[in-house]
UniProtKB/Swiss-Prot annotation:
This is Arginine--tRNA ligase. The gene is argS. Its EC number is 6.1.1.19. It catalyses: tRNA(Arg) + L-arginine + ATP = L-arginyl-tRNA(Arg) + AMP + diphosphate. The keyword Aminoacyl-tRNA synthetase applies. It comes from Thermosynechococcus vestitus (strain NIES-2133 / IAM M-273 / BP-1).
């Protein structure tokens, strides 16, 4: 199955070439109609070309329409207003398209014609610190982008660029050496919560005790030089954090390949050497820097990006440049995506600029920063605990599951239903975690959003429970009607007689174009909105059109439409990282 918008776009392009031959045409040629009264798709290409060609848009439209060969897809194309072209898909085309999608796990969506090698850099917590609510968005958004690109046939390397190197390890090792030396030689000697507490105390000592500062810096040097005891201690600390991170990744069903900052240490000197060789690196106040184009300080002078500090140390920019080169040269990536908070936008713009000016980024390679806003509490401020502490991510997820369980148990009591503990555990976890993911992904990532358990767990509105319930309604048909989807005849026609059937069918065939839009804009909320509207359209169809009691062949047709809706919801939710449930 090829998306209708792609077929119509190709036909429109051919018609334009026949009627108005030009080297290029305005893009996009075609978009989904803004309102039902304008059809299913619209084009304003004639309006865009009017000035260039010196003709009225409507006159141009009248020249183009006779060359449009779309009789197999659409009703006669309508010229509307000053020169818009309106396209309405035929029910026969919709039925044939959906029938072709029925037998495919991919719902007829073909993989990309030109698959890319993509690196998605996301999550990236710091060792010896607990993951907090600030890591939620990067982890969920990055995973969703990776899932969609993988589905489209791209090769995706999901990288976790953990903060596993730096001065903080010298502080921590020096402090533990004094107060709890067993932690530096024995696995599992302390948990991550204790490690965080020790880290805070080590930081206080470092800031107030010059002698301790010297000891910490000596530990950093020992670590950098590969001294066995220091390196063993560092490995134990990293492993302890890694185990705790994995508990969260397992809960969220996140797959990642860890490649921390320390991995790139051997490549840092080459960054300095090569930037110097190409004439970009200069010395400024003892530091080695690259002066940036388009970035200025308060005095209006070019702003420097520090590559090597005056004491000879490296920083985040150095590591990110080394990582970028490695991903292009060794991983052979032709698209690198960084998913971080909006506060790092300037940093990545500067790193990308230096890499491009140094000639490290071939023309076929795309560098993309995917920024996102803050998670806010219901008071409109950054989400924190009542005592003002940053919320631990594990606590946030555990609370979501607990609230989901309480809602489920209350509903079971009201309905007089008895379910097994295993059922309650599975449903509570799926809805709780799914609600957290969907609440995040359904927002435009560029915006801040308000975190509310009550809203995200509601069965009403644009929420995960609402979508999961729509899927459950379809599965309920199989139980009440004793129906096996596998026995539905593949040759039975889709009738699409009722208006709600037609609206649902039109929406179902738009999945591919929705995924294309998401992978272009990297905005998962587009997919969420599609699935929400799909659930609404299905519920309208379900409430208006008898299914199990309908006569044949209407019953078979409507069951097929319900089945396709369920499969689309299942696929779409899986791309958001949310599993479906047969019962809730």
């Amino acid at each position: 199955m090829v998306a209708p918008i792609k077929i119509l776009g190709d036909r429109l392009r051919r018609a334009l070439q026949a009627a108005l031959p030009l080297d290029t045409y305005p893009q996009p040629l075609l978009v989904p109609a803004s309102q039902v009264k304008f059809g299913d798709y619209q084009s304003n290409v004639c309006l865009s070309l009017a000035k260039q060609l010196g003709k009225a848009p409507r006159e141009l439209a009248q020249e183009v329409v006779p060359h449009l060969e779309v009789e197999d897809l659409c009703q006669p194309v309508e010229i509307a207003g000053p020169g818009f072209l309106n396209f309405r898909l035929k029910p026969e085309f919709l039925a044939a398209t959906l029938q072709a999608a029925r037998g495919s796990d991919r719902l007829g969506i073909p993989p990309a014609r030109e698959p890319r090698r993509v690196v998605v850099d996301f999550s990236s917590p710091n060792i010896a610190k607990e993951m907090h609510v600030g890591h939620l968005r990067s982890t969920i958004i990055g995973d969703c982008i990776a899932r969609i690109l993988e589905f489209q046939g791209h090769t995706v390397l999901r990288l976790n660029h953990v903060g596993d190197w730096g001065t903080q390890f010298g502080m921590l090792i020096a402090y533990l050496d004094e107060v709890y030396p067993d932690a530096l030689t024995t696995a599992n000697a302390l948990d991550l919560g204790d490690l965080v507490t020790f880290y805070k105390k080590a930081k206080q000592r470092f800031d107030s005790d010059p002698e301790f500062q010297q000891k910490a810096r000596a530990k950093v040097v020992a670590l950098q030089q590969g001294e066995e005891q220091s390196r063993r201690a560092w490995q134990l600390l990293c492993e302890q954090s890694r185990r705790e991170f994995q508990k969260i990744y397992d809960l969220l069903d996140i797959q990642l390949t860890e490649r921390g900052e320390s991995f790139y240490n051997p490549f840092l000197p080459a960054v300095i050497e090569d930037l110097a060789a190409c004439g970009l690196l200069v010395e400024d106040q003892g530091a080695k820097v690259v002066f940036l184009e388009g970035f200025t300080n308060k005095e209006g002078q070019p702003q420097p990006l520090i590559i090597q500090k005056s004491d000879g140390g490296y920083n985040y920019a150095t590591t990110d440049l080394a990582a970028l080169r490695y991903r292009i040269d060794k991983d052979q990536a032709d698209w690198i995506i960084y998913v971080t908070d909006v506060g790092q936008s300037t940093h990545f713009a500067q790193v990308f600029q230096v890499a491009q000016r140094a000639g490290w980024v071939p023309p076929h390679v795309t560098l993309t920063h995917v920024p996102f806003g803050l998670v806010l509490g219901e008071d409109g401020k950054r989400l924190k605990t009542r005592s003002g502490e940053t919320i631990r991510l594990i606590d946030l997820l555990t609370e979501a599951i607990a609230r989901s369980r309480a809602d489920l148990e209350q509903r079971l009591a009201t309905e007089g239903r008895t379910e097994s503990p295993e059922f309650i555990d599975t449903v509570a976890r799926a809805i709780g975690i799914g609600a957290v993911k969907y609440a995040d992904l359904s927002q435009n990532r560029n915006s801040n959003y308000v975190f509310s358990y009550d809203k995200m767990l509601s069965l009403q509105g644009n929420t995960a429970p609402y979508l999961l319930y729509a899927y459950v309604r379809v599965q309920g048909l199989t139980r009440r009607g004793d129906i096996d989807w596998c026995t539905l005849s593949p040759d039975s026609p889709l009738l699409l007689e009722d208006e709600t059937e037609q609206h649902l069918a039109k929406h179902l065939v738009q999945l591919e174009e929705t995924l294309d839009l998401v992978s272009t804009e990297l905005l998962p909320n587009r997919l969420c909105q599609y699935l929400f509207e799909l659930s609404q359209l299905f519920n309208q169809f379900y409430d208006r059109c008898p299914i199990l009691s309908a006569p044949q062949p209407t019953k078979q047709s409507r069951l097929t439409l319900a089945y396709l809706t369920a499969q689309t919801l299942k696929l779409g939710l899986s791309l958001l990282g949310i599993p479906v449930l047969d019962r809730i």
